[in-house]
């Protein structure tokens, strides 16, 4: 008698506990990083857990990150994972269209981030930052994250939507943008169309946003004005089949770029300030560098901003310790294997920059604030292309990274010229709710 061995591949270890059906949904909403770090400490670079009826496979570490980011789209899909963005960006935009159509749309977006546009943005950013900080008076107390959220909305709208929109920007736009952001939460990830108050506000805000942008488009066409901004580029853009973009499509692409450039910038700017003030020994070098590059000049060139290498290292260390994107997900469309484990299709794959960046295999003394880890002689972020992933990685890396870094550099340069800063409290922790 002969027998054939059955090759049964092991599945990732499971984080036990959680509530029936909900699993770890509530804990993930309250403090996702604590939950994911607990699983990593228990199981290492791969484990799974239940999340609202779905099986989530969590991957962490540079090698696991590489497997996540290099997986083909027909295996790990962004489209199915990010359907919660459809009510905000709109039907037929980004994650609600075919890969070919999305590539065309990204082709419309990329010119807004080219070098000649970034040079113009440097001037817009400085003008907005100076005007904003002048409203602070000579002394006082500010909510830094709220201030950075407001300022980066002003900057992003001026750079990306245009002068007319920024000149007429009122508290209405801030409210609309806030209502759109309020539609992004854990529940929206699974059920983005439930009749909830936050989702109703989100939907009303988008309708009003289309109205505002449509009015600007109508005025430009009626008056024969042609701006030199991203809005104008979208107004004249055509798909490969010759189809022009509808006003709803234009609004959706503007919102896509606005979200990419604003949220990440606000978080990065606020935490850069906090971490530097918590570690003031790095401030003299940054201020000396700014004086050497710009002196008393009121204008900031793109080339000059690139010379602020000490400041850039501090921003990069902020990206590492307080990444603007704390979790990234994909829908698993085909079975995949990693490190001897087999993961079945149908669930979700997840990585977390906030967890991965704190691993000693990725960074030396990972919990220590140390911007010098990014000097050329150390270059800890270059151990692997997937060691520093605060803006994602691979072909789907966040397109707003260069915009965010430039914006933070300008904000910091203006801020340090006008104010001496100190923290009201020394200890600050992220609020994930």
Kindly label every feature range from the protein language model.
Residues 152, 156, 206-216, 237-292, ...:
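Central I-helix of cytochrome P450 enzymes
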Residues 280-282, 403-433:
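Cytochrome P450 heme-binding "Cys pocket" and the immediately downstream C-terminal segment
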Residues 64-65, 356:
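A generic structural signal for short hydrophobic patches within well-formed alpha-helices
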Residues 351-379:
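Conserved cytochrome P450 K-helix/beta-meander segment immediately N-terminal to the heme-binding cysteine loop
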Residues 164-165, 182-186, 217-228, 243, ...:
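Proline-centered turn/helix-capping motifs that create local helix->coil transitions or kinks
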Residues 11-21, 122, 126, 175-176, ...:
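Cytochrome P450 I-helix active-site segment
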Residues 34, 66-85, 363:
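Cytochrome P450 catalytic domain signature, combining two hallmark sequence patches
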Residues 9-37, 41, 55, 62-63, ...:
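Cytochrome P450 catalytic-domain helical core, especially the substrate-recognition surface
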